[in-house]
């Protein structure tokens, strides 16, 4: 499974990425081993994700989302919000 995800950083900025292991990747971001952008901006919080069968689709979607404005990303997040109590169970955080 491949995932595209959006994180909200401690400074309220948004980070978009893709991975094939969402649980491991979020832990890496929170441990300072993720993307340079999220280092020093943690802890991060998962606010949105989608899953895809193949890497190419996930990377294409990530590219699309990264080009959105902040307001468009916030609309995307609110249209498919994650219930906090459920997403932690879904990805074992």
From Swiss-Prot:
<dbReference type="InterPro" id="IPR035901">
    <property type="entry name" value="GIY-YIG_endonuc_sf"/>
</dbReference>
<protein>
    <recommendedName>
        <fullName>UPF0213 protein CPE1444</fullName>
    </recommendedName>
</protein>
<dbReference type="InterPro" id="IPR000305">
    <property type="entry name" value="GIY-YIG_endonuc"/>
</dbReference>
<dbReference type="InterPro" id="IPR050190">
    <property type="entry name" value="UPF0213_domain"/>
</dbReference>
<feature type="domain" description="GIY-YIG">
    <location>
        <begin position="1"/>
        <end position="75"/>
    </location>
</feature>
<dbReference type="Pfam" id="PF01541">
    <property type="entry name" value="GIY-YIG"/>
</dbReference>
<comment type="similarity">
    <text>Belongs to the UPF0213 family.</text>
</comment>
């Amino acid at each position: 499974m491949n995932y595209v995800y959006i994180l909200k950083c401690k400074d309220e900025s948004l980070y978009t990425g893709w991975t094939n292991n969402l649980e491991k990747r979020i832990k890496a971001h929170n441990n300072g081993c993720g993307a340079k952008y999220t280092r020093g901006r943690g802890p991060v919080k998962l606010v949105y994700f989608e899953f895809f069968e193949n890497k190419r689709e996930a990377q294409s979607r990530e590219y699309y989302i990264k080009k959105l404005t902040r307001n468009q990303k916030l609309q995307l997040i609110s249209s498919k919000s994650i219930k906090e109590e459920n997403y932690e169970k879904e990805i074992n955080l």
